[in-house]
Amino acid sequence: MAEFVRAQIFGTTFEITSRYSDLQPVGMGAFGLVCSARDQLTNQNVAVKKIMKPFSTPVLAKRTYRELKLLKHLKHENVISLSDIFISPLEDIVLRWGCSYFVTELLGTDLHRLLTSRPLEKQFIQYFLYQIMRGLKYVHSAGVVHRDLKPSNILVNENCDLKICDFGLARIQDPQMTGYVSTRYYRAPEIMLTWQKYDVEVDIWSAGCIFAEMLEGKPLFPGKDHVNQFSIITELLGTPPDDVINTIASENTLRFVKSLPKRERQSLKHKFKNADAPAIDLLESMLVFDPKKRITATNALAHEYLAPYHDPTDEPVAEEKFDWSFNDADLPVDTWKIMMYSEILDYHNVEAGVAAMEGQEFNGQ
């Protein structure tokens, strides 16, 4: 059994295996605290995320289980990868397990911090957007919608390598998908208008908002609230077409949209005066009201603007779709705990098998 050590970070106890040392806080969110650490086994810096009280409710239990399943399944250069997961011996798996620890790569910074510190030059904007779309092509091919894409969920290292992270809100591709998700500035209009019938296109809209922010140096649609957010969008992109308005299910929302003054779509080249024509063309194809007319990640990669980096032989898709069979399950917390424990055991068994195979190959050389 692994030896565990304790550390106090911001008043929170981290009980981790002795494999990890030099814990330093790097971020805190609604669901957990993230620390950097040194992996003694690989001599690499890693991020250790402690998920607080993941089994306090069935909803949070499913969220934690979903994030682990996704991290195990998604294996791509532009998606954050899982390198370890464990529970502390103080937490009882059946009765009161109150935390779990996910260990992933540590990239040093995120796009939000970069954007608030300095303007980005064209080649960096192109390279970052290329990697975002390359990651989305893979994620979408796995049957997964991120749903909460924003600059703080885009991690970057000193080599400008980029990885999409935080799949806690990710969902199955589902034409009847519902829910109030995503940070408002980057939220697609179909989520605000209908709360239903949305799919992978919501991530393309979010990526378009991030692209615009990289070009402009500030958020494109900084709405103060739900209503103001949509109004700001129409000021730039004009009134939604009738076929989009007709999909609105809520009478109150429909009444609000129809009450707005008729607006014409503004030319993005006047808004983004320093952007070249290919950048404007790609941005316009991403920020389209009708999700079915929005460009796909695959087609965006082939766009002229991303030509310096586009390589169709090195933009892989998922080998198989993600298994969402658990997602509609309405299970008690104890069942989610057992399922989570099973996934952790499976992860370590697979990792041990891979290590053994690599050892055999090495010894056979």
UniProtKB/Swiss-Prot annotation:
Catalytic activity: L-seryl-[protein] + ATP = O-phospho-L-seryl-[protein] + ADP + H(+); L-threonyl-[protein] + ATP = O-phospho-L-threonyl-[protein] + ADP + H(+)
Cofactor: Mg(2+)
Gene Ontology MF: a single term: ATP binding
Alphabetical UniProt keywords: ATP-binding, Cytoplasm, Kinase, Magnesium, Nucleotide-binding, Nucleus, Serine/threonine-protein kinase, Transcription, Transcription regulation, Transferase, Virulence
Domain of life of the organism encoding this protein: Eukaryota
Record-given protein name: Mitogen-activated protein kinase HOG1
Protein kinase domain location: 20-306
Chain ranges for the short sequence motif TXY as given in the UniProt record: 178-180
The record's note on its domains: The TXY motif contains the threonine and tyrosine residues whose phosphorylation activates the MAP kinases.
Family that this chain belongs to: Belongs to the protein kinase superfamily. Ser/Thr protein kinase family. MAP kinase subfamily. HOG1 sub-subfamily.
Annotated SMART domains: S_TKc
Gene Ontology BP annotations: stress-activated MAPK cascade
PROSITE patterns: MAPK, PROTEIN_KINASE_ATP, PROTEIN_KINASE_DOM, PROTEIN_KINASE_ST
GO CC entries: nucleus
Organism, as annotated: Ustilaginoidea virens
Function, in words: Proline-directed serine/threonine-protein kinase involved in a signal transduction pathway that is activated by changes in the osmolarity of the extracellular environment. Controls osmotic regulation of transcription of target genes. Involved in environmental stress response, hyphal growth, conidiation and possibly secondary metabolism such as ustiloxin biosynthesis or the biosynthesis of other phytotoxic compounds that are inhibitory to rice shoot growth during seed germination. Plays a key role in responses to cell wall and membrane stresses but not oxidative stress.
UniProt-annotated catalytic positions: D148
Main localization (coarse): cytoplasm
Location in or out of the cell: Cytoplasm; Nucleus
UniProt-listed Enzyme Commission number(s): 2.7.11.24
